Amino acid sequence: MKKVLIALDYNPTSKKVAETGFEMAKAMGAEVTLLHVTVHSFLYTSVYENMGDWQTDSKDTIAIRNTGSRNFLEKAKRHLGDNAVQIVVRDGDFAQKILETADEIKADCIVMGSHSQKWLENILVGSVTEEVLRKSTIPLFIVPTKKQ
């Protein structure tokens, strides 16, 4: 195993996912890439809000969101204490961007957490981990993060 992609979100359990994936990668002498995927804001708003006024995110909104994501990943990288860790921010569908990034960097394994997000998000986009598991052509290491 030469490259490991660790997909992180803003959930507090991401620390556990990052640490577990990093330890596994280092034990195998693999390079690590941390990934955060941002999504269009309309997925997080009420379906009834501005029903007829669908607008795409402005370039400024996307830039602000991406800066926040990059800062989040830089903080995770500092926590892991390895300057060789790469960081990647993508915008779009979670599962699709995770799979595309894994392909782009030629990852040998994807590391993700098993927690679910907000109930509305699960209805709208389904379980990201489940979708990546179904569509991935490389091993997926799932870190259980649900509280006992």
How does the language model describe each region?
Residues 2-55:
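Small/aliphatic-rich secondary-structure junction motif
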Residues 35, 86-90, 141:
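General small-molecule cofactor/ligand-binding pocket signal
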Residues 49-53, 104-106, 128-129:
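Short, hinge-like loop/turn segments at secondary-structure boundaries
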Residues 54-68:
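A short acidic, glycine-rich active-site loop
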Residues 77-110, 147-148:
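Structural beta-alpha unit
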Residues 109-131:
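Glycine-rich, Arg-bearing micro-motifs that act as flexible, cationic patches
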Residues 138-146:
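Short, flexible loop segments at boundaries between secondary-structure elements
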